[in-house]
């Protein structure tokens, strides 16, 4: 039985990105923006984009979105070119904030440009 997800689109979570290889974002505990809707998240996997204070390549290439929070004190940019499907429960993620609606909308538009 799949555990109900408490994570919703727009949530900022603290989650481990290890293991990672190559150019993938890594880190034992880093913030990420939830992009998938709660109905999908209830299936056990969640689409997230890492948040960084670096990300120069992504900034110049148009793959990042400046982060503005409605809740929480997280700063940086959302790296849309580094999205990843994750089991947030298995990775013991916790909610640490909420992104502004315009941040989520812009991230989804940039993600759409990546996959089209």
From Swiss-Prot:
Underlying gene: chpB
Enzyme class, spelled out: hydrolase
GO BP term, pick one: regulation of growth
One GO molecular-function entry: RNA endonuclease activity
Disruption phenotype: No visible phenotype.
Top-level lineage group: Bacteria
Keywords: DNA-binding, Endonuclease, Hydrolase, Nuclease, RNA-binding, Toxin-antitoxin system
Induction of expression: Part of the chpS-chpB operon.
Protein name per its UniProtKB record: Endoribonuclease toxin ChpB
Gene Ontology cellular component terms for the protein in this record: toxin-antitoxin complex
Subunit structure, as described in the record: Homodimer, interacts with ChpS, which inhibits the endoribonuclease activity.
NCBIfam families found in the cross-reference section: PRK09812.1
Regulation: Stimulated in vitro in a concentration-dependent fashion by extracellular death factor (EDF, a quorum sensing pentapeptide sequence NNWNN, probably produced from the zwf gene product glucose-6-phosphate 1-dehydrogenase), which is able to overcome inhibition by cognate antitoxin ChpS.
Family annotation (InterPro entries): PemK-like, Plasmid_toxin/cell-grow_inhib
The keyword RNA-binding appears for this protein: yes
């Amino acid at each position: 039985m799949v555990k109900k997800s408490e994570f919703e689109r727009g949530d900022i979570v603290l989650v481990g990105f290890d293991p990672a290889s190559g150019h993938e974002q890594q880190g034992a505990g880093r913030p990420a923006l939830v992009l998938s809707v709660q109905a999908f998240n209830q299936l056990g996997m969640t689409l997230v984009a890492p948040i960084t204070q670096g990300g120069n390549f992504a900034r110049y290439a148009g793959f990042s979105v400046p982060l503005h929070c409605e809740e929480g004190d997280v700063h940086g940019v959302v790296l849309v070119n580094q999205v990843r499907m994750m089991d947030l429960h298995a990775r013991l993620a916790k909610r640490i904030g909420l992104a502004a609606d315009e941040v989520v909308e812009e991230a989804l538009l940039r993600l759409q440009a990546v996959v089209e």
